[in-house]
Structure formats: C-alpha cells, structure tokens
Amino acid sequence: MKKFIIEPEYDGYEIGTYLKETKGYSGRGLRNLEIYLNGKRVKNNSKKVRKLNRVLIKEKDKETGIKPMEIPIKVAYEDKNLLLIDKDPYIIVHPTQKKVDKTLANGVVNYFLKTTGKIMVPRFFNRLDMNTSGLIIVAKNSYVQSFLQEKGTVNKFYKAIVKGIVEKDEFLIDRPIGKVGDELRRRELTVEEGGQEAQTKIKVVKRFEEENLTLIEAELLTGRTHQIRAHMALEGYPLLGDELYGGEDKRAKRQMLHSYKTEFTDVETGKMITVEIDLPDDMKELLEKR
C-alpha cells in the first residue's frame, strides 16, 4: 500500500498519467493496482486529479504457478522493496519447459512464503546464466519493478577470469551482437543484420603471466544475453571455463564469471545503494593457487 498527495503542478492530470510520470508505473503495472482518490475507488485511469488530492494504491494479489521449494537462498541485501540474492553457480534462475522446478525462482517463492506468509510472484529484475554466479535483484511488487525499469538507475559489475594477458588497463568494447538462427552462441552482427547494440567497460584487476590468465572487472552498459562472454571472446580473451565461446579447459568446471557488485536507486529516497559480495569459492581457490 502506498499513499501520495497530488503536487500542485499535476493539477488536472489523469490519474494514470500522473502515476506513470511521477511514480514509474507502466501501463501493465497500472492494471495490477487498486487506486483510491480521496477514499473512493477509481474505476477509470483517465480520472482527473486535483492538487492536494489524496491517492492510495494497493497492489492486487497476483498468483504464481511457481511452487515453493526448499532451495537455499543467500541473501546479500533486503529491505521492504527489494531482495538481492547471491546466486550459486549451477542453478537455473527461472523454470523452463525442460526444468520446471528446483530453480532459484522456486527458492524465492519459498523464502517469501516463510518470511511474509504469502505466495508472492518472484519479480526478477535481472537474470544470470546457470553457470554464472552472483547478484540477482528481485522486486517485491510491481511498483518497484516498474520504478527500476522506467525511472531508476541500476549499474551491474562483474569479475571474470579470462584466457590470455589483457594488455590495456581499461577499455570499452562497443560491438553489436546477436544470434544466428537457433544458435545459443552470440556473434558480432551489424544492426542491419539484426545485431543489438552492446557496450561493456573493461578494467584489468590483475594479470597472471605464468598461467596466461587475467582477472578483469566488466561493467555492463547494456544488457544483452551472453554479453560479457561474447564480447571477451570477440576480443580474443574468452572466459576461462566457457565451453561455448572458449572451448574446454580443465582448470575450471564453469565459466569464471561472477556478478559481484550492483548499484541501484533506492525507491524511497532516490539515493544510490551499493551492494558488493565476495568472489565464490571456486574462483577464489583458482586465483589463490596462482
């Protein structure tokens, strides 16, 4: 439940337009709301508001077909609006036709059931590949989800171990990528060929000359499927353990990629919050041996 007072500059606005422009709701998000104006239920989003009107919104209960399951959830950060999870590798985020349960989503539904007593929809703001570890944002309601998508800022940083010695300390990869046919693998494609704009900022953290490996930080400026994996492979530095883009390597059982830091706009205060987590054990053990 949220309450607002209409600001003078929005006098005469339609209630739907007001909520979209000032609160970050999408058209889809508005359909999930019960809206009250000065205590009376609003049945049409074209209803005009007046300055100092009181607005109360309630989110309609939404069911999910994802059943709760006892899947371990490592909470990196939580408040009344968001849950940030430190995802382990080797777990799928959301059910698919081939994998209908034992996913992270099943664990999140179970976590919410235990902590709130309700079956809540797991609203993932971002997802990670099965073999990628690290931070995933889960919005607790459609308002927060819409806010992050439409109004808020979210910055995502990864650490990765790549093959080869990356020469430049810092650089920007600006190469459009896309898939060809039904291939999982992303390739460099021009926009005309169906490629999507993709930008990744790279910074070298440490070079391991004897092992011919480099630990890098990658900041996503866009969010494309396999973006870091594809971009580093295109640059000639595939991720260690990434069989799809770099071939098999006995030193790693999975791609050495970890979402270690996320910055996001707090929906209540507008201030930026930073959440940072440590590397997973397999990446730490690999680096400590060097």
Model-inferred region functions:
Residues M1-R28, K206, E210-E211, L221, ...:
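Pseudouridine synthases involved in rRNA/tRNA modification
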Residues I202, I216:
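Long C-terminal interaction/binding lobes of large macromolecular proteins
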Residues N126-M130, G194, F208-E210:
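A short beta-turn/loop motif at secondary-structure boundaries
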Residues M1-L172, P176-G178, D282-L286:
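RNA pseudouridine synthases
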Residues I57, D182-R186, E197-Q199, D242-E248:
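Short Pro/Gly-enriched beta-strand edge/turn motifs at strand-loop
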Residues N126, E170-F171, G195, H226, ...:
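Residues that recognize and position ribonucleotide moieties
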Residues K67-E70, N155, T190-T200, M256-L257:
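Short coil-to-beta-strand transition motifs
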